[in-house]
Amino acid sequence: MFGRAVGRLLRDRTGNVLMMAAASMPLLVGAAGLATDTVQWTLWKRQIQRQADSAALAGAYAVAQGFNASDSATADISRMALVALTQTPTIENAPTSGPFAGNAQAVRVVLQTSAELPFSKILGVKAPVIYGEATAAVVGSGDYCVVSLEKTSTVGITLQGNATVNLGCGIVTNSRASNAVYAGGSSTVAATPVAAVGGLTSSSNYATGTTLLPYSIPVQDPFAGLPTPTAANFTGCNQKLSAKSGETQSYSPGCYNNVDIKGTVNLEKGVYYIDATSFDVGAQATINGTDVTIILTSSNAANNPSSISTININGGATINLKAPTDTANPYHGVLFYQDRRALDSGTNTINGNASSVLQGAFYFPGQAMSFSGTSGMTTDCVKMVGKRVTFIGNSNIVNQCKDTGVDKFTATLVKLVG
């Protein structure tokens, strides 16, 4: 009887699954554990890559602003500290490898981590070395012909009323306003890119295809190197530059402290210093000049910056003025230049009629400027740099500046490039 019981037990198969499950349980637990460790390694990979991206961008932003790339990248790595690093970070400016190798405007960061995890250690799986590598660079964001140097939260560039602005280039402002460029009313704006240190709001006033670049890095003053007027420039500054209605007058370069143009004025080649007065051009006046630069300043600018000259060119005036083209001239490409010591208390107005021809840069670093073009006005090469810039009326600026002495304004942005 005992023998029959043993035989039945040997023939019984109902416990096989349980036995097989018990035998395979270590493998199942190990596989699940290894999967858990793999998820952790994947998370670390994402975190270390994010840390490398952030550090490279911090380094590139430092380069853009003239600071030390390595210091900024190192500080950013310490700040984020998403992953415990097992090797000293590699920070290169310029990179030694990749498409930006040797580029001093680029920063490459390589980070490394490695750590054993419980399940993989039990299974004898060696912990992988996880890398994060990123390269960020300061690159050009486009060519600009309108630059606003405003640094506060005030709107930098305004396009209003029925202004039709076709610039054939970009516009950029250092304004930190939430909408740093205002395109309102029935204005139509064809300018790309549109960049700002602050925010930018999409608008139907922008032409189709316009690229908006909010939160860009500040643009440098493209004319920061122009010399500031000195006492020597004001020698014999007791002259009047004027023409009555219906008469024609010609003038030589020099210093003038009284300007009132109602007739026709011809300016000879050279630099004209306008001392502590308003450069007024009447509605029916005509002013002609080639290779000229008009500097709005004051002989007492150091003690009384509010005395610095301004400009007011009325609509209807015929303005035929071209800046110097000789690159040996320190003012090459500059048509109007207001002393940068001017207080932010005035607006400079430049208008013109359909017969006007303007070529050169308008530079008003300390004050606002307003430009109102007219249909048919020739402005093939005009650049504008002001603390704030306002467009009213029609402005069709093609900006074909070859051989004119007017340099391009190229702004930059920081982005990941590898």
Annotate the PLM regions:
Residues 1-75, 173, 177, 274:
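Alpha-helical assembly-interface signal, strongest on the long, hydrophobic N-terminal helix that forms
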Residues 16-18, 26, 30-33, 38-42, ...:
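Extended compositionally biased segments used for macromolecular assembly or nucleic-acid engagement
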Residues 39-46, 50, 54-117, 136, ...:
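Short amphipathic secondary-structure patches
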Residues 117-231, 343-385, 389-394:
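Short, ordered "entry" segments at domain starts
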Residues 153-160, 173, 179-183, 253-258, ...:
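Beta-strand-rich extracellular passenger or scaffold domains
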Residues 161-165, 185-189, 200-212, 243-247, ...:
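Small-residue (G/S/T/A) turn/hinge positions that recur once per unit in extracellular repeat modules
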Residues 214-237, 284, 291-299, 312-341, ...:
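Acidic/polar low-complexity surface segments
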Residues 232-243, 402-418:
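Short, low-complexity, Pro/Ser/Thr/Gly-rich segments in the mature regions of secreted, periplasmic
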